[in-house]
């Protein structure tokens, strides 16, 4: 496998882990580990939960007054099961914490660790060469820090791959967000049409009742006629 493709795959795997989320991968890996190893603690936890649930159901059906002996026995069984379950959960949490430490170490070794080793081992080698005079005075930057002049170093190639993947990620997110917004807005909806169709209570009130000045004029005219 060429150095160019190797560096790209390492950067791609690193970004893929970042996109999915390391905590999500940890949960998947831990559940797979429990299934493959048939962990006795997990099996005991499932059976104990089922037993406690059955005892609680039976306890609710039992009267404490009419069947006190049976009720007390079920109550002691539920309390004992809950105490054992709490202890078991603590042991499982400790085991999961240990698994998480090992898993994170493996992920770091497969991504950042491998990237550092390749950058150090192939630091003086060229990933590929640029056409002569193509980049002008910036040619030295592409070979930074120790690659031959006129070539692209491992560090610069890794940086370029990461930037391209980040740009693609942003483009996909913007496209997905635009499609989501288009689905949420109803077809043919226009804020101006909705505002124009809404009746104005002030205009209705002004058209339905005379103004105070008009009322005063009418009252004065009627009093003059009487006199």
UniProtKB/Swiss-Prot annotation:
Residues 24-107, 169-227 are cytoplasmic. The keyword Ion transport does not apply. It is found in: Endoplasmic reticulum membrane. The keyword Acetylation does not apply. Residues 190-211 have a biased composition (Low complexity). GO terms for biological process: tail-anchored membrane protein insertion into ER membrane. The chain crosses the membrane at residues 4-23, 108-128, 152-168. Residues 72-96 form a coiled coil. One of its GO terms (molecular function) is protein-membrane adaptor activity. Its main location: endoplasmic reticulum. Keywords: Coiled coil, Endoplasmic reticulum, Membrane, Transmembrane, Transmembrane helix, Transport. It is a multi-pass membrane protein. Residues 1-3, 129-151 are lumenal. GO terms for cellular component: endoplasmic reticulum membrane; GET complex. InterPro entries: Get1 (IPR028945), Get1_fungi (IPR027538), Helix_hairpin_bin_sf (IPR029012). Pfam families: CHD5 (PF04420). Residues 184-227 are annotated as: Disordered. Required for the post-translational delivery of tail-anchored (TA) proteins to the endoplasmic reticulum. Acts as a membrane receptor for soluble GET3, which recognizes and selectively binds the transmembrane domain of TA proteins in the cytosol. Belongs to the WRB/GET1 family. HAMAP family: Get1 (MF_03113). Interacts with GET3. This is Protein GET1. The lineage of its organism: Eukaryota, Fungi, Dikarya, Basidiomycota, Agaricomycotina.
